[in-house]
């Protein structure tokens, strides 16, 4: 995961918060934009504001913006954005543990979540933007 502080005049949409509440993915729910290099208007990228501390040990903090690529598959060991029960968004590691898939936090105060039919991948976390 890279922290991206580069300035750019190219923008991607910020679609809401993730990790501690509902996640709205529709285009009409854009709450802002963020400059992001090497992208265009037809990009598969969007940003979500982090709420909560379940990924703190990976360096993902409250109010960080995570950049999501909705067309990049999430593989074992990747950090991804997921929709749970069609209402709650979260970012976690996707990990195979003893033949089963889990969403795994980077904070020992949270439990792993077994992947089932109620969990849908949104996209892979490809970058992070932090306001210093």
Pin down the residues of each PLM region.
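Short, positionally conserved secondary-structure boundary motifs
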Residues: 1-61, 89, 96-101, 122, ...
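C-terminal regulatory/effector modules of DNA-binding transcriptional regulators
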Residues: 61-132
């Amino acid at each position: 995961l890279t922290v991206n502080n580069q300035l750019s005049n190219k923008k991607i949409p910020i679609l809401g918060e993730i990790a501690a509440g509902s996640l709205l993915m529709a285009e009409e729910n854009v709450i802002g934009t963020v400059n992001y290099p090497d992208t265009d208007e037809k990009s598969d990228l969007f940003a979500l504001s982090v709420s909560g501390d379940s990924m703190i040990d990976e360096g993902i903090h409250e109010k960080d913006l995570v950049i999501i690529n909705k067309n990049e598959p999430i593989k074992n060991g990747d950090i991804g954005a997921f929709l749970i029960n069609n209402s709650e968004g979260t970012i976690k590691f996707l990990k195979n543990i003893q033949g089963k898939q889990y969403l795994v936090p980077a904070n020992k105060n949270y439990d792993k979540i077994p992947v089932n039919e109620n969990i849908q991948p949104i996209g892979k976390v490809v970058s992070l933007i932090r306001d210093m």
